[in-house]
């Protein structure tokens, strides 16, 4: 398959890589769309020691199932791989699994033609949702998680509050959009980067 491989700081090489071989409980996904996360940019610039080259980056992804019983289904991928058996996983708090790994961090990510991932990490998407939009499911989930935490700890509904989102990147803007969809009428986005203002 073709892949965009991070080979050293400030260098990506488009080259042939072996097709991933799905393990037990995994399926092969044909990547149709992949977002560029700010963390991928940090890695590209050499500011993330956890991402050791050579590595295929990318964890915001949507595509089509290419193997298994769901072959042909359109999906977004939850890029967080977990053990599935610890107390955190069994209670639905997979983000706290101590064995968690993120695709594109230490294992191959989605800047390629195919990625293998556990079938439990697939999120079916309707035909009405385009795959580029679906690839934003992961950053949208991060925003929604923060918003749900705020709702849980607030004594008043969001529609009665003023909100400030610090940072106008993708997650910040998604957070602002979600806040307004929850009825928050006073949302301010604070951003120091002049290119984003």
Set out the residue ranges of the language-model regions:
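Cysteine-cluster motifs in flexible loop/terminal segments that predominantly coordinate metals
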Residues: 37, 79-123
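Residues that mark the start of a beta-strand
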Residues: 2, 26-28, 161-162
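Mid-domain Rossmann-like dinucleotide-binding core that forms the NAD(H)/NADP(H) cofactor-binding site
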Residues: 130-197
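Short Fe-S-cluster ligation motifs
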Residues: 62-69, 113-136
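Short Gly/Pro-enriched turn/cap motifs at secondary-structure boundaries
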Residues: 7, 18-19, 52-58, 103-107, ...
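Cytochrome P450 core scaffold surrounding the K-helix E-X-X-R motif
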Residues: 39-45
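Glycine-rich beta-strand-centered segment in the early N-terminal region that forms part
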Residues: 18-34, 47-87, 126-128
